[in-house]
């Protein structure tokens, strides 16, 4: 066959891109999720969480550093969180499996199998449990959920830093589990039209106070914001702050919503974090900080109102 009549080479076929998950299915990966409050992780204590369907051990070393491991021993699938934090022969802090005493450093590498004898010559460091990158700032612990569970790559960006984390410890912390996929919980966070009906309260605003209004939205990194504006005049909750409050509400993937209110030099930050536990359960955490003196007077009433809001949303979703 001559060169001119030779068959053309077949075009190489690329693997098709994975089909995007339908609404209410799957999770957003390769990003940071809120995992826990820093105050929940005590030095030396091991705690079990469920995040994106994964069993996760979150802990804090005796030196104060937070870490995350898959909460399954690769030997007999015992939960590592049922073990204890100890030290291996090299002096490194390590999690001891409660079943056969295998030791795993906080980077996930196995450092000791007590039942082995020296003559066996096994390289135990080839055994690993999945390590989840963890970052802690502003009293919040975030966990990086990678699409490749075998990847050792570090995250390419840090978690969100929030404006308005002022006044020392949070003025309110509330938690609840919604029996829905995170997509439905996120829609509940963004939906502006349900407020007059679901959250009609005498101290907030009544159904009779509805009126037409428009808000300006702008893009933000991995999300968008309702740009800073004067809050609704018909809201008594804003009125008690006095002065001329301004508020900006920001939404960021995969499940963060925060409202930053300024009243002169005073600030209020209301942060809502959605953490998928599984395909059918989502943990919602509400945290409020402020340096406004009014919170010292209304703290019990404010906490009760905020908890009522959260449970009203839970009833709907």
Regions found by a protein language model. Give the residues of each.
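Short, low-complexity intrinsically disordered segments
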Residues: 30, 100, 142, 200-202, ...
